[in-house]
Amino acid sequence: MERTCLAIILAAGESTRMKSAMSKVLHPVAGRPMIAHVVDALASASITDVALVVGRDAEAVSTAASTGSVTVSSFLQKERLGTAHAVLAARAAIEKGYDDVLVVFGDTPLITAAPLTAARERLAEGNDVVVIGFETADPTGYGRLIVKDGELLAIREHKDASEEERRITYCNGGLMAISGSKALDLLGRIGNANVKGEYYLTDLVEIVRSLGGRAIAVEAPEEELTGCNTRAELAYIERLWQQRRRQELMLAGVSMVAPETVFLAWDTELAEDVLVEPNVVFGPGVRVESGAVIHAFSHVEGAHVRAGATVGPFARLRPGADLGPKSKVGNFCEVKKAEIGAGAKVNHLTYIGDAFVGAGSNIGAGTITCNYDGVNKHVTRIGENTFIGSNASLVAPVSIGSGALVASGSVITEDVPADAVAFGRARQEIKPGRAPILRQRYEAEKAARKKVKAAE
C-alpha cells in the first residue's frame, strides 16, 4: 500500500485501576512493555510514522515505544478530556499531511497488522471513517456498532442503547482509521456537550454522516482488541499472548509436551524439531537451534542453545550462555556468560560463569568456577577434552589446558598445563581408633552446654 499513514497511539491515561507506580503501557507482556507490542504491529502493517500521545511517565513511555522500527514523535496531553482531545494533542503531526490517520491504543498489545491494514484498505476505497470492531458472545458494557446495508450509522454506548440495540453483538473496539485530508476538520467538529464534558472520538461516525460522508466498520478478532486496565486483565492478556505464540511455534515444527506450562518471551526463537518439556520458562534473548532438547523445569534467558544440545532438567541458563552443538547442561546447573564447547558435558550441580569450556570436556558434579573476587569478575578457560573431577573449585583467573585432568575436590588457583594431572587438596590422613575418643569428647561438650543453658 503506497498511501501515507500516521498512526496515533493514545497512551496518556492515568492507569488508576492498575494500582501501579508506573503507567500501564509500561507493564510487560512476554517480557516487553505492552506499548512496544503495539508499535511492532504498526511496523508489521508498514506504518513508519507514529505520533505518541503521552501523559504520566512520558519519558519512559516514549523510550519504550521507540523500538527502532518506526519513527516516533511524542506529544503531551496536559488535560484528560476524552479520546478526541487526546488525538488532537498530536495536531502538529496530523498537519504534516497523510492519506490515512490511524488511531490505536497503547494498552492493546495483542493487536496484529491484519485489522490495521484492512481499515486502511477501506479508506482507500473512498470511506471517510473506518471503525475496527469485534463480535462477542457477551456485549454487556460495550458500545454497539449500528450497521445497515454495510454502512456504520452510529456507535451506541450500552447505557444509551435500546433493548433492540443491546441485542447487537458487534461492538466497538476503539481503534479507528480516518481520512487524512478530512481528519482535522472532523475532529474539530466534535463537541463536549455531555455529562463529563469530554470530547469523544466515537462521535465522528455521526458527524461524518451528517456531512454526507461515509463510515463503515471492519471486524477483528475479539482477543486482538483486548485492552488492559487491571492486573487481572494483564494476566489474561499474557495468557492469550502465550497461547497464540505457542500455537505458532508448534505449527512451525516445535514440540511441546505440555504447551500450557511453557512460557515464552516476545523474541524467543525455537527452531524446527526443538523439544520443550513441561514447566520451562524462556526469558528474552533466547535462540534454540534444531534438535535441541529443553528438559522440564528449566529457566533460559539470554542464551544460545545450538543444534542437538540438551538443557536440564532443573537447569538455569543466564545471559551470555552459549551451548555448543550436542553439548549438555544437566540438572541443577547454572551457566552464565560462558561458552560450552561442542559435545562438552556439565551434568550435575555445577556453576559455570565467565568461562570457556572446550569441546568434549567433562565437568564433574559440584564444580564451581570462582569468578568473583568481591570487586571484579574473572575468566576461567578450560581446554578441549579436559576432565574436571567432582567438587572442584576453579579460582579465576585460571586456565586448564586441553587434555588435563583435575582431581576431585581440588581447589585450583594456578594454571594447569595441557595433559597434566592437578591435585589441589590436602593429603588424606587416617588415625585408627580415634573416632570413639572424639565422640566421647563431643558428648561431654554437648552435656556441658545443656548444663549451662539449664542454669540460665
Curated annotation (Swiss-Prot):
<keyword id="KW-0677">Repeat</keyword>
<dbReference type="GO" id="GO:0000287">
    <property type="term" value="F:magnesium ion binding"/>
</dbReference>
<feature type="binding site">
    <location>
        <position position="107"/>
    </location>
    <ligand>
        <name>Mg(2+)</name>
    </ligand>
</feature>
<dbReference type="InterPro" id="IPR011004">
    <property type="entry name" value="Trimer_LpxA-like_sf"/>
</dbReference>
<keyword id="KW-0548">Nucleotidyltransferase</keyword>
<feature type="binding site">
    <location>
        <position position="408"/>
    </location>
    <ligand>
        <name>acetyl-CoA</name>
    </ligand>
</feature>
<feature type="binding site">
    <location>
        <position position="351"/>
    </location>
    <ligand>
        <name>UDP-N-acetyl-alpha-D-glucosamine</name>
    </ligand>
</feature>
<feature type="binding site">
    <location>
        <begin position="10"/>
        <end position="13"/>
    </location>
    <ligand>
        <name>UDP-N-acetyl-alpha-D-glucosamine</name>
    </ligand>
</feature>
<dbReference type="InterPro" id="IPR029044">
    <property type="entry name" value="Nucleotide-diphossugar_trans"/>
</dbReference>
<dbReference type="GO" id="GO:0016020">
    <property type="term" value="C:membrane"/>
</dbReference>
<comment type="pathway">
    <text>Nucleotide-sugar biosynthesis; UDP-N-acetyl-alpha-D-glucosamine biosynthesis; UDP-N-acetyl-alpha-D-glucosamine from N-acetyl-alpha-D-glucosamine 1-phosphate: step 1/1.</text>
</comment>
<feature type="binding site">
    <location>
        <position position="24"/>
    </location>
    <ligand>
        <name>UDP-N-acetyl-alpha-D-glucosamine</name>
    </ligand>
</feature>
<dbReference type="GO" id="GO:0003977">
    <property type="term" value="F:UDP-N-acetylglucosamine diphosphorylase activity"/>
</dbReference>
<dbReference type="Pfam" id="PF12804">
    <property type="entry name" value="NTP_transf_3"/>
</dbReference>
<dbReference type="GO" id="GO:0019134">
    <property type="term" value="F:glucosamine-1-phosphate N-acetyltransferase activity"/>
</dbReference>
<feature type="binding site">
    <location>
        <begin position="371"/>
        <end position="372"/>
    </location>
    <ligand>
        <name>acetyl-CoA</name>
    </ligand>
</feature>
<feature type="region of interest" description="N-acetyltransferase">
    <location>
        <begin position="253"/>
        <end position="456"/>
    </location>
</feature>
<feature type="binding site">
    <location>
        <position position="157"/>
    </location>
    <ligand>
        <name>UDP-N-acetyl-alpha-D-glucosamine</name>
    </ligand>
</feature>
<keyword id="KW-0479">Metal-binding</keyword>
<dbReference type="InterPro" id="IPR025877">
    <property type="entry name" value="MobA-like_NTP_Trfase"/>
</dbReference>
<dbReference type="GO" id="GO:0000902">
    <property type="term" value="P:cell morphogenesis"/>
</dbReference>
<feature type="binding site">
    <location>
        <position position="172"/>
    </location>
    <ligand>
        <name>UDP-N-acetyl-alpha-D-glucosamine</name>
    </ligand>
</feature>
<keyword id="KW-0012">Acyltransferase</keyword>
<feature type="binding site">
    <location>
        <position position="425"/>
    </location>
    <ligand>
        <name>acetyl-CoA</name>
    </ligand>
</feature>
<dbReference type="InterPro" id="IPR038009">
    <property type="entry name" value="GlmU_C_LbH"/>
</dbReference>
<keyword id="KW-0511">Multifunctional enzyme</keyword>
<dbReference type="Pfam" id="PF00132">
    <property type="entry name" value="Hexapep"/>
</dbReference>
<keyword id="KW-0460">Magnesium</keyword>
<dbReference type="GO" id="GO:0009245">
    <property type="term" value="P:lipid A biosynthetic process"/>
</dbReference>
<dbReference type="InterPro" id="IPR005882">
    <property type="entry name" value="Bifunctional_GlmU"/>
</dbReference>
<comment type="subunit">
    <text>Homotrimer.</text>
</comment>
<feature type="binding site">
    <location>
        <position position="77"/>
    </location>
    <ligand>
        <name>UDP-N-acetyl-alpha-D-glucosamine</name>
    </ligand>
</feature>
<feature type="region of interest" description="Linker">
    <location>
        <begin position="232"/>
        <end position="252"/>
    </location>
</feature>
<feature type="binding site">
    <location>
        <position position="390"/>
    </location>
    <ligand>
        <name>acetyl-CoA</name>
    </ligand>
</feature>
<comment type="similarity">
    <text>In the N-terminal section; belongs to the N-acetylglucosamine-1-phosphate uridyltransferase family.</text>
</comment>
<keyword id="KW-0963">Cytoplasm</keyword>
<dbReference type="InterPro" id="IPR018357">
    <property type="entry name" value="Hexapep_transf_CS"/>
</dbReference>
<feature type="active site" description="Proton acceptor">
    <location>
        <position position="348"/>
    </location>
</feature>
<dbReference type="InterPro" id="IPR050065">
    <property type="entry name" value="GlmU-like"/>
</dbReference>
<feature type="region of interest" description="Pyrophosphorylase">
    <location>
        <begin position="1"/>
        <end position="231"/>
    </location>
</feature>
<keyword id="KW-0133">Cell shape</keyword>
<feature type="binding site">
    <location>
        <position position="362"/>
    </location>
    <ligand>
        <name>UDP-N-acetyl-alpha-D-glucosamine</name>
    </ligand>
</feature>
